[in-house]
Amino acid sequence: MRIIKYLTILVISVVILTSCQSSSSQESTKSGEFRIVPTTVALTMTLDKLDLPIVGKPTSYKTLPNRYKDVPEIGQPMEPNVEAVKKLKPTHVLSVSTIKDEMQPFYKQLNMKGYFYDFDSLKGMQKSITQLGDQFNRKAQAKELNDHLNSVKQKIENKAAKQKKHPKVLILMGVPGSYLVATDKSYIGDLVKIAGGENVIKVKDRQYISSNTENLLNINPDIILRLPHGMPEEVKKMFQKEFKQNDIWKHFKAVKNNHVYDLEEVPFGITANVDADKAMTQLYDLFYKDKK
């Protein structure tokens, strides 16, 4: 009987201790004691808007929020340094769904759960903002940010709907040495649609496709957008050289009418970001600058 009584007391004690530890852990989480490491610039900028501290940040030539200036770098978004991240003792390491497959080995080495967010479109990013707000106790900030983006989007869509003619747009996404054509499934394609442009590329199952200038000439867009990704100045020079040396471009209506525009990585980009309000506004102004 004494043994049974002793075991009963021991079990109760363990349950109480475990309960207390669980409660303490929940309180810690509720108080916002997260150690967050975003692995992409877009996520870093979003966390700043949600007023969240971070313990690690991606290595980037882009300017990150000043509040994170003393935060340690953890490497490139596609190749974060496992040991550098481990040293930070993170509770959450964040990435985007676009590179989920590529990031799985990284999370396996960390022995941590991967958190992936959709930044492929404005709608996807807004859903991710809500998820981040719920996850890190920033619901009010997430709602405020999404309300602002919705307001700008609605305003742009309403103005575009009143236009009698919508420009046909070709979007070129350049990297050093080459370029691809963006479809509606890409983030920039999504923005073009919101701003009242019609993407001349109708592919539905891919974000980007390889280019064929002869086929593009047959489509003959009203506007050509050139978006750099990585080393923007080098990519701009590449585009200028391509359009100057490849004789076929001079036959494009957009080139003849000087409707070829180089977009900046900020506020644009290949993934959605919190500067989407500025990007939508700039695109609308480009498309309808003669209609004001």
UniProtKB/Swiss-Prot annotation:
A Gene Ontology term for the protein's cellular component: plasma membrane
One Pfam family in the UniProt entry: Peripla_BP_2
Protein name: High-affinity heme uptake system protein IsdE
Function: Involved in heme (porphyrin) scavenging. Binds Fe(2+) and Fe(3+) heme but the largest fraction is Fe(2+) heme. Functions as a high-affinity heme binding protein and probably has a role in relaying heme-iron from cell wall-anchored isd proteins receptors to the probable permease IsdF.
Triggers of expression: Repressed by fur in the presence of iron.
Listed PANTHER family: HIGH-AFFINITY HEME UPTAKE SYSTEM PROTEIN ISDE (PTHR30535:SF36), VITAMIN B12-BINDING PROTEIN (PTHR30535)
Organism this protein belongs to: Staphylococcus aureus (strain N315)
Segments forming domain Fe/B12 periplasmic-binding: 35-291
Lipid-modified residues, S-diacylglycerol cysteine kind: C20
Record-listed heme binding positions: V41, A42, S60, Y61, M78, H229
Alphabetically ordered keywords of this record: Cell membrane, Heme, Iron, Lipoprotein, Membrane, Metal-binding, Palmitate, Signal, Transport
Top-rank lineage group of the source organism: Bacteria
Covalent lipid adducts (N-palmitoyl cysteine), residues: C20
Origin organism lineage: Bacteria, Bacillati, Bacillota, Bacilli, Bacillales
SUPFAM superfamilies xref list: Helical backbone' metal receptor
Localization annotation: Cell membrane
Segment forming the signal sequence: 1-19
NCBIfam families: IsdE (TIGR03659)
Entry GO MF terms: heme binding; metal ion binding
InterPro entries with a match to the protein in the record: ABC_Transporter_SBP, ABC_transptr_haem-bd_IsdE, ABC_transptr_periplasmic_BD
